[in-house]
Amino acid sequence: MRIVAILLLFCLCRAAEPRKSSPGVLRSQGNPSRSHGRGGRRGSSPVKRYAPGLPCDVYTYLHEKYLDCQERKLVYVLPDWPQDLLHMLLARNKIRVLKNNMFAKFKRLKSLDLQQNEISKIESEAFFGLNKLTTLLLQHNQIKVLTEEAFIYTPLLSYLRLYDNPWHCTCELETLISMLQIPRNRNLGNYAKCGSPPALRNKKLLQLKPQELCDEEEKEQLDPKPQVSGIPAVIRPEADSTLCHNYVFPIQTLDCKRKELKKVPSNIPPDIVKLDLSSNKIRQLRPKEFEDVHELKKLNLSSNGIEFIDPAAFLGLIHLEELDLSNNSLQNFDYGVLEDLYFLKLLWLRDNPWRCDYSIHYLYYWLKHHYNVHYNGLECKTPEEYKGWSVGKYVRSYYEECPKDKLPAYPETFDQDTEDDEWQKIHRDHPAKKHRVRITIVG
């Protein structure tokens, strides 16, 4: 028992030895100024970083100077920032207005990150002096209106982010939208959507037609006048596929004929093979109207009064075989309208007021190059001097060296170079050729 007691006493003495130094440790922690070693210097470094004299980090990475001033509750640009900065990170601050000449002294700036601030106004010369700026991030702010004029001073701008802003899509945005839709600006303003008016909410800026925003008729539709009578009007959607008839046999068909539609329905079932939109009031085809209907093979758009087809309207219709555009108001096709129709076989073009000038050349040469596409109805309606001519005849005369007054006189009964007759003959014989089979047996 004595031996056990001695051992316990010895253990207690050993355990009490470290506690003797603890008061000194506590004193050194309570007064860090007494510490002159490396540990003391490390402890003071965070204080220097967030000192009022230098609220932001300036560093060099891959030989390019950066200013990192994110999450500092800034409301303006500080005057003591270096002028030779190449990249400026100002995200997640409290900036509300970008004033004229705000960044004028940073002439070497390449990228400017202003996302997740509270920006609601950008003055016309806010980016003055930024001749070398290539990247500008303005997403997640409160911007409603902006014009092309603000970007006059950024000729090298190639990457612009504008999404998650409550864009007010009216005539004030016309110049900005026109700038974003220039083909070379394919990385400017992607994913930005309208926040108002309600009729255009969630519509991408790149899908809008700038001229529509300033059209008086469109304004009346977006901002209707209050009703005089107390009876509420029945609101019917302009484009709702539930108004159409869906047939499964013999093929998946959506019949939207004579439904008073003004736009292509946005909720077309993706497995539809045949779509009939004839005899409606669709005046133009917007970009990517049919991008979700991948299986579509037959599309009827006749008798709508279509005046314009966007070059990206048929994007995604790689399986389309038949397209009926007859009895509309088409005068020509913009370059690129037919580029995605790889397997097109039949194209109806009759009863359109085709205008024979240089703009018709794209359609003619596309058909000439895609000789497997059978078409009809490509006849000049205007100008008067070419009325009744086939478009092919007009294009050939366009490149003749003789002046117009020396061209041979064509009788008015000229039969369109027999293009339509040849098409009908080929179309008539086509089913018979499809059933011919040649079998070769190799011994």
Swiss-Prot record:
LRR repeats lie at residues 84-105, 108-129, 132-153, 271-292, 295-316, 319-342. It is found in: Secreted, Extracellular space. InterPro entries: Cys-rich_flank_reg_C, Leu-rich_rpt, Leu-rich_rpt_typical-subtyp, LRR_dom_sf, LRR_TM_domain-containing. The lineage of its organism: Eukaryota, Metazoa, Chordata, Craniata, Vertebrata. GO terms for biological process: bone marrow development; negative regulation of osteoclast differentiation; ossification. PANTHER family: ANTIGEN BSP, PUTATIVE-RELATED, INSULIN LIKE GROWTH FACTOR BINDING PROTEIN ACID LABILE SUBUNIT. Residues 1-15 form the signal peptide. Residues 229-270 form the LRRNT domain. Residues 165-216, 352-404 form the LRRCT domain. Involved in bone homeostasis. Acts as a negative regulator of RANKL-induced osteoclast precursor differentiation from bone marrow precursors. Expressed in osteoblasts, spleen, lung and heart. GO terms for cellular component: extracellular space. Keywords: Leucine-rich repeat, Osteogenesis, Repeat, Secreted, Signal. The gene is Lrrc17. It comes from the Eukaryota. SUPFAM superfamilies: L domain-like. Residues 20-48 are annotated as: Disordered. It comes from Mus musculus. Induction: Down-regulated in osteoblasts in response to pro-osteoclastogenic factors. This is Leucine-rich repeat-containing protein 17. Gene3D superfamilies: Ribonuclease Inhibitor.
